[in-house]
Amino acid sequence: QYAPEWVWAQNQDLPAPGVRGMGNTYTGNISDQPDRFGTDAFVRGYTGQSYVKAHLGPLAIGLSSENIFWGPGRFAGIVMTDNAPGIRHFTFETNKPLKTRWGTLEGQLISGKKMRSGFIYTTGPNADGSSLPEVVRAPELDTVFSVITAAAGVWNPIWLPGLSLGITREIWTEGPVSADASERDYIALFYTNPFRGAGGGTEVDVDQMASLFFRYVMPESHAEFYGEYGFDDNRYDLEDLLVSPEHSRAYLIGFNKLQSISGNTEYIDFTYEITQLEGSKEMINRIQFGYPVFYDSDYNHYGQQIGSGIGNGSNQWIVSVDHVKNNRRIGLIYERIARNNDKLYAGQVPWVATWYGFDFTKKYVDSSLGVNYQERFGPILFWGKALLTQTYNWNHWYDPAGTSSPMRANGYNVKSLNVFVGCTIFI
């Protein structure tokens, strides 16, 4: 399959965040997440959802640049999503469930390269005299990559129809390795200790992530319940895992229900989903440098997060209600995202402190209400979404024109309208 992708974006100027916290953008260029991709329009071409695979019965092997979405989430995922462009990778996977006496098994093993964005932060002050470094183009990084190898497996036990249990594990090199990559880096998943996280084919350190997930489908009720629990920082040993399971954790939980209103052709589709990436208090005193984040290391591809796209240390919950009839879907959606709480709780925001102290109530939150639409006409599928968003404390900015009180700082609140439209042509 050859399905390339081309992206054009205005990449307009925007105010830089008041402070770049380590959970958002590392000032030392450790985590490749630019606030802005240079000053020109963003134009990129990718091989997209292309692949070459050989199918051998229930198994497939090949090369691919497809996006991978692991986990049960409907709106988000923890370890692998379509937020970043697809990674070019080798894949060995099942193309249909493998039947065993204990139930069915599905899985995928990948090994590939995640690329740098091609932008870095300068070390000196900006031209306007501010202390935040600028994002500048670095063409020498266009060919620099690091290695990622990952696997996911799903078991559907024969004794509990409708239940799926899954596990994922990802290993990647920290920092660019480029031509110094060893063959061992591409198979690090098979020999890296799940507790110590040590070992690699080169001098480059490795990092790892893992998750457990489930999905329970109730066909007679037209409903499902699902969840995922992820770990970003490897444990010292089994004791550490059992004593502090909340360390470096993220979780996702959701519920979906289809309520028939006219036979099998018309439904009300209700979904509720929560994604929590903000770390627990365990992470403040451990090796995440005092920043309560998930994705604390360089888990990015072309400068975009491979996992959930809501941002490090962010939380999201979504409620959607759709009317579905034949080929048409229309409905309402409410979405709340608390962005970059890691920066807030680490004191990395430009608030003017009140007499009471630092104001931790001023979270950077997007509260959005919108409509969804999707309908197919012959070979063409049209879709669209419009969101009216009220943003509180945008970018953690302080508003000097606001009215303060002894207990609260002045947040900068804004409104915006976001419209998304698209179509897919089936050939």
Regions of interest found by a model, annotated:
Residues 1-159, 241-249, 262-273, 292-312:
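Outer-membrane beta-barrel channel domains
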Residues 156-427:
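Exposed, low-structure sequence patches enriched in small/polar residues
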